Regions:
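N-terminal segment of the mature soluble domain
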Residues: 41-110
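C-terminal motif of bacterial Sec signal peptides marking the signal peptidase cleavage site
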Residues: 15-18
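Short low-complexity stretches enriched in small and charged residues
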Residues: 3, 26-31, 53-68, 190-191
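C-terminal/domain-edge helix-coil "capping" segments
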Residues: 20-40, 50, 131-191
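Bacterial N-terminal signal peptides that target proteins for export
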Residues: 1-7
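Surface-exposed short loop/turn segments
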Residues: 85-150
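Structural motif
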Residues: 11, 35, 92-95
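Short, charged/polar low-complexity linear motifs in solvent-exposed/disordered segments
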Residues: 62, 119, 171-175
Length: 191
């Protein structure tokens, strides 16, 4: 009985992880940060996307995943007139921001795979045959960068890949989960 339960549990966990189509491909952290880790308490979230609705959805989802009160959407904080970098940095510091998360789509890779047909009917072959077919896969690469407002430099960078995403909502949730998990593991964001 225990063996059956263990096998069933293992199978269900395997199926659960097999459904996830997003993974963290690469990440880099500033070596100086690992010497003095202190989680960021308040971050500005920026997701420059093609349209304002998608940007709002993405930024809202990211802020929702970060610890309560730690994230602020750029669409509610930044003004179109905020073009001077030094003035903006001073304003961010004055308002208590210590980090900025910028997430953007960097590439969409397309690949075509030929899947050969199969024949049935034994050694004399081709009594019954299913034809081959082509499949096209799209991999969306999203880069996320974490900047220190005080030091004015990149502290962490990561690239996620999402294979054949079915919806923006699901893809964003998977990407944000992968990034949040990595940032918390590195001690950059609080758990």
């Amino acid at each position: 009985m225990k063996t059956k339960f263990f096998l069933l549990s293992t199978l269900l966990i395997g199926l659960l992880f097999a459904c996830v189509s997003t993974k963290l491909e690469k990440s880099w952290a500033d070596p100086s940060f690992s010497l003095k880790p202190s989680p960021y308490k308040k971050v500005l979230v920026v997701a420059p996307l093609k349209d304002a609705a998608s940007q709002r959805i993405a930024e809202d989802k990211i802020v929702k995943q970060i610890k309560a009160g730690a994230g602020v959407q750029s669409y509610s904080y930044l003004k179109p007139t905020d073009t001077d970098e030094k003035l903006l940095q001073a304003q961010l510091l004055k308002d208590g921001f210590d980090g900025i998360i910028v997430m953007h789509l960097t590439d969409v890779e397309k690949s075509v795979t030929y899947n050969p047909g199969t024949s049935y009917g034994g050694w004399y072959g081709y009594r019954s045959y299913s034809p081959g077919y082509y499949t096209e896969d799209k991999t969306f690469l999203v880069e996320t960068n974490m900047y220190s407002v005080k030091d004015d430099k990149l502290m962490w960078s990561g690239t996620t890949s999402s294979l054949n995403p079915t919806s923006l909502d699901k893809s964003m949730d998977e990407i944000i989960y992968a990034i949040k998990t990595e940032l918390q593991k590195k001690g950059i964001l609080e758990k």
